[in-house]
Amino acid sequence: MKTSFKLVLFVALWLVPSHQCRSQTIRGKVYADTEAAFAANVFLKHHTDIHAITDEDGQFELPLQDGILPDTLMVTYVGYKDFVLPLTVQNLPDSLTIKLLSNAISLSEVTIMADATSSKEFAVTKLSRLEVLMSPSASADPLKAMGMMAYSTPTTESANPELRGSASGYSRVVVNGVPIYKPVRNQQLDGMGNFSLFNADIVGEQYVYPSNPPLEYGNATGGIVNIRTTQRLPEGQHTRVSASLASIGAFHSFKMGAQSFVQTYANLQSSELYRPVNAKGLRHLKNFRSADVGLNLHTQLSKGMHLNLFSYYINERYAANRGLFNYRGEQNATNKRNFNILNLAYSTSWKNSFALNTATDVASTHYLFGSITDHTQQLSTFVSLAWKHCLTENLSVAVGLDNEYLRYKYNGEYPSAYFLVHPSNEHNHRKATSWMNKSEGYVYGKWQMGKLSVGGGVRQMVSKLFSSTLSYQASMRFSPNKHNTIIASFGEYNAINRPTYYSRTFNKAFSRQASLDYSFTKGNGTLSAALYHKRERLPFLSPNLQEMLPIAQRITGIEVSGKYSWKQFTAFACYTYLMSSTFIDNKWQRAENDFGHTAKAEISYFNMKLINISLNCMYHPGKYFTPIIGKHDVGTQPYPVFGAYNSEQLPHYLSVNLALNKYMQVGKTAVVAYLTLSNILNRNNANYTYYDEQYANPLIEPLQKRLLYFGVVVNF
């Protein structure tokens, strides 16, 4: 603890601002035609970390430090020409009135890629790259940026999206129209992972549908996180290097002509420094190491035709202690994965646009734990073709077809029953291949009638493994004025789950749900509320029968959240009441996430001249679980005896976290130093239970305790 305290003190002193730095603030108002431009991006061309977003009145404040000029002020807004103003010390204005000029050609070109989704209006949340980077709790991770939202109902400290009571495996992350399964790194046996695979610098837009996922995308019964990569860059080249307690990384982007650009990045992660500093907070962790590289290429092939290629490769391994059933030991995992997404978009006019999306995903994993020695090779391909036709300016229809092929090859030593994981238990060698090919088609229509938007669609899924299924949905968005918005949706959804360790087969999932969302925005304040209900039919592993069975689940939730900004402070709080039950043993019983009351809060202080500080807190009751009350021997093998379903509960979860960062200017170079302190209270938050070898005593495996993390980012 003394070492950690010294490091905190050292970094905190480093973050203290220098009194020799002088600063000035540019204030202004941005107009799009005659209306105030809401959410326009304002930034410096050569120092993109100095940025602001206009409020609903089009106003912004941009703090500058001495020595940063000369530079160029940039204002970007979709559908309008970029505003460019050279800045020098001599001509630095105190205030600006900026009037953006319409750019019909630019709007048409942007629409090809960015507006390919007809159902955008029905998303509950939209996050931009800047919002992901500025979120104190996100750690610049696009998926973790949702963690503080009211609709995020996690049962673990994971980057996997768990939306409105649905388990993470039933929500989909879609990137440029392509579903990305297992979108996390450091993935464990239960499918959970610590960080997402995506770099925030390549994210252009991120839409979140926490329930009633749009039928333009399939195979989701929970929700959808729809990520669109960057489609426009400011002029010039941008380079960023970073170093932290556990990683080093680099990012570089440059334009190739007016409509083409390249973004590339690479990272190396290692626990060599991270684990010794946090030895008391990470007792289960042995080591980890990973290397990843990504490329995003966007180019204009001809007038109205754009191509985008996003390619990603990761090589990772980790070792950590884990407890499962009656064994606790070291688990070792390695993973090599490469996925590629190619998008071709073509627009003949504002009335017609076409999109072709293709993807490949190849992975090879090794996993060792107890009696398990697993080698899995995964291959998946995806192709979709979509056509969007605008019958009028307010009425559109989208039609699409997609095909997905999945193949898993398993080879290794596996226990004869899923709970016989102790190394001394009976296990045998197995080799198998599972595959599935499915095709889906959809029709989606949208009609805008002034302040009211109505959308609806159907989606048909066909596969040789299962009978044909039909999904449908309808949505309505009503905005009586600029302050109030109501979104109502209902639908019925079908999906096919991929194999897991507990089930090497494909299984069907079904959900019928309805949701009502309301938001109020005025000035610096936002108030949101939601009510939703789901009835799901999901595959369930019967502990006694040792096979997958379909069971019913119902989820009801109420959400209330508020956000308010004043001067340099921002406060956010949300409350969720979640009821979740499962129909098992011929009666409704509580599900593991039948939390009832949950709450989150965050307060932040942003001051580019001094320091940025954020403090957040998350609380929810502990998970329910089915206890093991004894054992009986089958031959020489110990079989657990399970108690009443979800009759016991883990202690409640409470985590308080601190984040600090400081912006500094060194000549023409921008430097951001940051520090985070997780679980400040050093609580023993419970992760799961396991047992001794005789199943006599239950043991609780804790989550991470207090952790220190710090680093620096340098922008050229």
Spans of model-derived segments:
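Short, acidic, small-residue-rich periplasmic hinge/interaction motif at the N-terminus
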Residues: 31-35, 41-45, 76-80, 90-135, ...
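Short, acidic Ser/Thr/Gly-rich low-complexity loop/linker segments typical of extracellular
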Residues: 48-61
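A beta-strand signature from Gram-negative outer-membrane beta-barrel systems
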Residues: 98, 195-236
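Periplasmic N-terminal accessory/gating domains of Gram-negative outer-membrane beta-barrel systems
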Residues: 117-171, 177-213
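Flexible loop and strand-edge segments within Gram-negative outer membrane beta-barrel domains
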Residues: 271-274, 284-290, 305-382
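Membrane-embedded beta-barrel scaffold of Gram-negative outer-membrane proteins
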Residues: 357-361, 479, 508-556, 563-571, ...
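Gram-negative outer-membrane beta-barrel transporters
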Residues: 448-452, 533-535, 549-629
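C-terminal beta-signal and adjacent terminal beta-strands/loops
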Residues: 619-635, 662-716
